[in-house]
Regions:
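Short, well-ordered coil↔helix boundary/capping segments
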Residues: 71, 97-105
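A beta-strand/beta-hairpin structural motif
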Residues: 92-96, 144-146
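Short structured motifs
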Residues: 94-100, 114-115
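HotDog/MaoC-like acyl-thioester-processing domains
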Residues: 1-31, 103-108, 112-160
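Hot-dog-fold acyl-thioester-processing enzymes
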Residues: 7-94, 154-160
Length: 160
């Protein structure tokens, strides 16, 4: 838990615009402590409705998209990874999330992330990062995300 607190302190200072980052695959792009940057986008009920349809979610709780589904916010963790590191075939392994509040139609969604681990396991290259999703600067979701960014099979073909 201490690592999350440290990572979030770093994230508060991030303010990096992903569009200015070179999309790269070198190891330095995934080094522990690397800030993946901050993305900002408006959240609208229309986007929420599209997500609910794609996810086949029909709970009235989300008010036809006016309240953001947690899956929509979690997907931003994938996007921030893809926006920073060139990805070929990759695998979303696991996410551990905490919900802190709601994101509503018309609010600005902001996603921040920082690398906490970059390891090789069973031949797979795995990156772990802490992330936050904010709704108009209020914490809505935080979590940790694990992804195999280079599967063993891809590495074996590349090195053959």
């Amino acid at each position: 838990m201490a690592a999350w607190s440290l990572a979030f302190a770093i994230l508060e200072l991030a303010g990096v615009d992903l569009r200015r980052l070179a999309v790269a695959a070198p190891a330095e792009a995934r080094a522990v402590g690397t800030v993946f940057g901050t993305t900002r986008e408006p959240y609208t009920a229309e986007l929420g409705r599209k997500h609910l349809i794609n996810a086949r979610e029909d709970l009235a709780l989300f008010d036809d998209g006016a309240i953001c589904n947690p899956g929509y916010m979690l997907r931003r963790a994938n996007y921030i990874l893809a926006g920073h590191v060139r990805l070929g075939p990759w695998i979303h392994v696991e996410s551990e999330i905490r919900l802190h509040g709601l994101l509503h139609d018309g609010e600005t969604l902001e996603t921040r992330a920082v690398v906490t681990e970059n390891v090789e396991k069973n031949g797979h290259l795995i990156v772990t990062f802490d992330f936050q999703v904010l709704a108009d600067e209020r914490l809505a979701m935080s979590g940790q995300h694990w992804a195999i960014y280079e599967p063993r099979q891809v590495r074996e073909k590349t090195n053959a």
